[in-house]
Regions:
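Short amphipathic alpha-helical coupling segments at ligand-binding clamshell hinges
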Residues: 55, 154, 193, 197, ...
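A ligand-binding cleft/hinge motif common to bilobed small-molecule-binding domains
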Residues: 98-104, 220, 225-246, 300
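A bilobed periplasmic-binding-protein/Venus flytrap-type ligand-binding module shared by bacterial periplasmic
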Residues: 140-147, 183, 262-275, 294
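Mature extracytoplasmic/periplasmic domains
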Residues: 270-329
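Conserved C-terminal helix/tail region of periplasmic/extracytoplasmic solute-binding proteins
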Residues: 327, 331-363
Length: 363
């Protein structure tokens, strides 16, 4: 999931970050320097821009510090934090599974038992406080309803000649929503059949993106017909970003129940970050009832069980997920298989096709 300010401005999206925020879509020599002495730095998977825009000014005013944000794909933000491990540049990390577990296992996160984690279910946080669910969400696919009149209902539907060269999904190595494609197909079909399916799906695939957020723009521009995504981001882009999008959930077989799983944004404190005191305060604030009550405004589900999924947008989330079967995911098993799955995807699915794997927004 990767969005930037210039992309938003170009395509009229509502997710325009405050002047105090910093967004970077590419990490490397051209990346924006995020840290300043009077700042707290947040590395975040994209999709939550409107929430940050709404809630961070109050934090900045109260604490007298700026919140500088670096936004990229969920795998990318962890990769950057890993590169910087010996000299951390960020204080707080927000990303998706399995990358939050990867960050924890790699020693990037510092245990911090925020008082506001107490209403997060035990299954939705690390026992030692290394991370906790910040915004709950669901994996989904998306179409442009103005163009794709016959909505795909099963995974097999995406293999139809009508979709040749019109499907795109994000790279599992760099995007949590991309890894989610492997997780869901493996859960429904079994691992070997899932990779056989994904190899067949390459006939329909136009390319793969480095993150997932840019796919919403490509869908709305009719450059592709179907893409992967997540419910919160897709609903928010449609309602607040002016994009023509409709989230869809696919079934394993004709007549079957559409199926998905929870794919939450999780938050954690980066070990030895330059401004840990303010990093802890930022986590406390983002997990407060005040902020969590605004999560439904961006079509997210509060991470805290004591904050209801309420309001008009909360009802839209409930309607979107109605009738969809939710399956559990063993994230420890995903972490154990992640490296093998990524290698198998590159070798067996992509192979020597020469297909692009890291498409990003045009410069």
């Amino acid at each position: 999931m990767t969005k930037t300010n210039s992309l938003h401005a170009k395509f009229g999206l509502a997710r325009k970050l405050l002047p105090t925020l910093v967004a970077a879509a590419a990490f490397g020599g051209t990346a924006i320097q995020a840290h300043a002495a009077d700042a707290v730095v947040l590395y975040t998977a994209d999709g939550l821009e409107n929430l940050y825009k709404d809630v961070l000014p109050a934090f900045e005013k109260k604490e007298g510090v700026k919140v500088n944000i670096v936004t990229a794909g969920s795998g990318e933000v962890v990769n950057r934090a890993t590169i910087e491990k010996d000299q951390p540049k960020a204080d707080v990390l927000v990303t998706l599974p399995p990358f939050i577990q990867q960050a924890d296992q790699s020693g990037l996160l510092q245990a911090y038992q925020s008082a506001n984690y107490k209403n997060v279910p035990a299954i939705a946080k690390a026992p030692n406080g290394a991370w906790a669910t910040f915004v709950n969400n669901y994996f989904s696919f998306a179409i442009n309803p103005e163009v794709t009149k016959t909505q795909p209902k099963t995974f097999a539907d995406l293999l139809h000649p009508d979709f040749t060269g019109k499907v795109a999904y994000s790279n599992p190595a760099t995007a949590g929503d991309g890894m989610a494609v492997i997780i869901l197909t493996s859960s429904l079909m079994g691992e070997d059949k899932a990779f056989d399916y994904l190899k067949k799906l390459e006939n329909s695939a136009k390319f793969h993106t480095k993150g997932t957020g840019y796919l919403d723009v490509l869908l709305s521009r009719n450059e592709i017909a179907v893409a992967n995504g997540d419910l919160q981001m897709d609903l928010d882009d449609a309602a607040n970003g002016g994009l023509s999008l409709k989230p869809v959930f696919l079934a394993a077989a004709p007549g079957g129940q559409p199926t998905t799983f929870q794919l939450p944004y999780a938050i954690g404190l980066i070990k030895n970050g330059p401004n840990q005191a303010e990093g802890k305060k930022l986590i406390d604030y983002l997990m407060s009832t005040e902020v969590q009550a605004k999560v439904p405004d961006i079509f997210g589900i509060p991470g805290r069980t004591d904050v209801p999924l309420a309001g008009k947008n909360g009802e839209a989330v409930k309607q979107a997920i109605a009738g969809v079967k939710l399956i559990p995911v063993d994230w420890n098993q995903v972490m154990a298989k992640k490296a093998d799955w990524t290698a198998r995807w590159k070798n067996d699915v992509i192979g020597s096709s020469g297909k692009q794997l890291d498409v990003v927004k045009p410069k």
